[in-house]
Amino acid sequence: MNIAANIADDLETGEADTSGHALFADAPRSVSFNKLRKRLLRQVRQAFDDFDMLKGQKRWLVGLSGGKDSYGLLALLLDLKWRGLLPVELIACNLDQGQPNFPKHVLPDYLTKIGVRHRIEYRDTYSIVKEKVPEGATYCSLCSRLRRGNLYRVAREEGCDALVLGHHREDILETFFMNFFHGGRLASMPAKLLNDEGDLMVLRPLAYAAEDDLAKFAAAMQFPIIPCDLCGSQDGLQRNAMKDMLADIERRMPGRKDTMLRALSHVNPSHLLDPKLFDFSTLGVTDPS
């Protein structure tokens, strides 16, 4: 089913939209907000189509950190579900990692208010990260692994087919350049991935969405944002350097982020240097199997 191309809905009129899930009850009624909302919905639907995200899917665990991106992801999925465009059960999950002064009431209160099934899981990964990571080193890698492992466990316990995450265009580009500059390889975040155990999909429906758009969407929707003190307390992260580099390129050459993202879906193995992808003796693409 080509959701992005074949489904017409009232957002296509470009007029202020007053319909949608209950969480949109207090959303702006302006045409500009409607255009933003329409653009994000279209990009999510395009990701569904391009990466066949809905195939065999019945229940998703949606990771909710309390940041703008995961709030936006949940809102857009609920919007599509309300419109009958997402035949998948959604469960929102926040992993309370034991950070000091974490406002424990914010997410359950918000999710209860908008009527979303949810699970708040407590695991003190904060203390583990602080203990294991040497002074001056970055927390991101270990923190991410611990968080992902717990989310996989919850997804299995809830009978979910996939873990759905809020990574966006900039996350994908930053990861590509981190691997390029620091890992010596061409790789990024896949929009759809089977986990190592082979029992869960990892999906990123915001792969085409711009971070600026998600920030505007979050501000307009007045999501109760929770800052990450663990990561936010660190300076000089490699990812921040990549973010600054991409922002500088975009300032000097507008539209380059979209061009770079398109490049990730137009790979020519014969014009690279990897004999595992291209057989230079027969001049044919190598069978990955």
Curated annotation (Swiss-Prot):
One of its GO terms (molecular function) is sulfurtransferase activity. CDD domains: TtcA-like. GO terms for cellular component: cytoplasm. Its cofactor is Mg(2+); [4Fe-4S] cluster. A motif (PP-loop motif) lies at residues 65-70. Signal peptide: none annotated. [4Fe-4S] cluster binds at C140, C143, C231. Binds 1 [4Fe-4S] cluster per subunit. The cluster is chelated by three Cys residues, the fourth Fe has a free coordination site that may bind a sulfur atom transferred from the persulfide of IscS. Keywords: 4Fe-4S, ATP-binding, Cytoplasm, Iron, Iron-sulfur, Magnesium, Metal-binding, Nucleotide-binding, RNA-binding, Transferase, tRNA processing, tRNA-binding. It comes from the Bacteria. It catalyses: cytidine(32) in tRNA + S-sulfanyl-L-cysteinyl-[cysteine desulfurase] + AH2 + ATP = 2-thiocytidine(32) in tRNA + L-cysteinyl-[cysteine desulfurase] + A + AMP + diphosphate + H(+). It is found in: Cytoplasm. The keyword Metal-binding applies. It is an enzyme of class 2 (transferase). Pathway: tRNA modification. Transmembrane segments: none annotated. It holds the Pfam family ATP_bind_3. The thiolation reaction likely consists of two steps: a first activation step by ATP to form an adenylated intermediate of the target base of tRNA, and a second nucleophilic substitution step of the sulfur (S) atom supplied by the hydrosulfide attached to the Fe-S cluster. Belongs to the TtcA family. PANTHER family: AMINOTRAN_5 DOMAIN-CONTAINING PROTEIN, SULFURTRANSFERASE-RELATED. Catalyzes the ATP-dependent 2-thiolation of cytidine in position 32 of tRNA, to form 2-thiocytidine (s(2)C32). The sulfur atoms are provided by the cysteine/cysteine desulfurase (IscS) system. This is tRNA-cytidine(32) 2-sulfurtransferase. It comes from Rhizobium johnstonii (strain DSM 114642 / LMG 32736 / 3841) (Rhizobium leguminosarum bv. viciae). The gene is ttcA.
